[in-house]
Amino acid sequence: LGRINNDPLFGTTQADLFLQFKPPFYPYYYGNQGDTLVGIDSVVLALKYSGSWGDTTVAQQLEVSRIVDREFSDSSFKYHNINYSPMLGLPVSSIENIDIRTLGNKVYFAHGKDSSTNQIRIHLDPIYANEWYLYDSSQTGNYNAFRSDSLFRKLINGLAVKSVGSGNALMYLVLDDPGTRLEIHLRKRYNGRMDTSYVSLGIQTVTYSDLFQSAVANHVQRNRAGTPSVNPGPDELYLQTSPGSYVNLHFPALHPDSISNRVIN
């Protein structure tokens, strides 16, 4: 995830992330049975960070949008063009400036009750957060997303995290880590007592019963126009990705049958 705007050899790189967060069960409810939901304070998108490549002194600018593409779902039988990215709706966050150098610092949240490190945290719009107050598990209605997996995907089919504006590095994320989640911070009442807490929706990695695996996609677009890698000279080789990319070097004066294995500098 991220953007490289200034690579003199390989040009620009844009990496966007698309993912579905899902409840751990259906019908879903907030907190514990018997709790009465009073209100939603905020919704936070959290992404587990594991490293980066590039110039981390330039802040990354990230923006979150809704995924409104009904074709965005996990399937072993679905094939997409390499340029595919889901259709998006309106943004549900402001543009967040991420200083990669500070992601290792401890961050406290939930009124100081919890903390995290190596985590990108993006607060989503209050209007979007308020929608989560309306969702329920009723059999009918316009907001019964918590009733079943199919109804959930119909109303909430995922979020896109796009790099916009500045940036000169790529960030590596761990999607199946508990640190990657959608946090819903809420106020609830139990036995007449008010409390604040949060619940998390994660990336579902397996399919069982009535809960289906989450869909995830990573769209990486490179523009090498005008760079040396487009038209390399006869004495030049450019490899942008590793592992998986390699070249064979052939030296006419060095025959493989005439020498043993050697390291040549």
Predicted regions and their residues:
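Secreted, disulfide-rich extracellular signaling modules
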Residues: 1-265
